[in-house]
Amino acid sequence: MKICPTCGARLSGKATSCSRCGAMQPQTSGGPRESAMVGEKKFLQFPKETSGLEMSARAYNLTIGGLLLYGFAVCAILCFFFTAQISMLNPIAVFIGFLVCGLIGIVVANISNSAGVRFIGFNLLVVPSGIFLAGCLSTYYFETVVYALVGTALIAAIMILCACIRPQWFDALGPVLSISLVSVIVVEFSLRIFFGRSSTFIDLAVVIIMAAFIGFDFLQANQARRTLCNAVTFALELYLDGVNIFVRLLKILSRSQN
């Protein structure tokens, strides 16, 4: 039972209009569906940068795609045109430099509020990783490299498509994927210490985990605010996913050929 605020008539609780004066009656409850939608909206927000102008969805995704193309183009240039010069460098120094610059780049790309500074961090990862890959690719057959590239592209396309069609698959995967990746790294490190080698199963596990990370990172990118800073950061994360898959596929394919 409720009272019409216009004429004071008594109405049933489900009435949407007053039978005496015809005034529309306010609905007092939004119900569980409204509460669930509010909770879902709050849960789906993963902001990495909370200031700056927001871009359209199309411009935002094109920016991420353009940054990824730029990163892989830099890698390709270093691998195809500077392999001879890079192969003359000390491999241990190259690896250490890659790790140091990569870590600095990741930190810079995540803590700065300037898109330009984040782009510098992006390059601090892209260029050393290109140099590192150029030194590695000289030990593989050209066909193996091509197969690994095609495989990486197909995996990335499939996972992004899955993230678009079934985003709920990737919503809560972040902690699970992180724990899985750390566990695999620990196992691989132990194998190298005690047996002096890794395993194809480890490489397959990393490929599967990083493939899931592509879907997860793409979903996060489109749930965060569509700013230029976030576009750079998520492009870096997707770039890392792709490079890891490519390197592991190279190892798997080279073992199968041998």
Name each region found by the language model.
Residues 2-12, 16-258:
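A hydrophobic alpha-helical transmembrane-helix feature that marks the membrane cores
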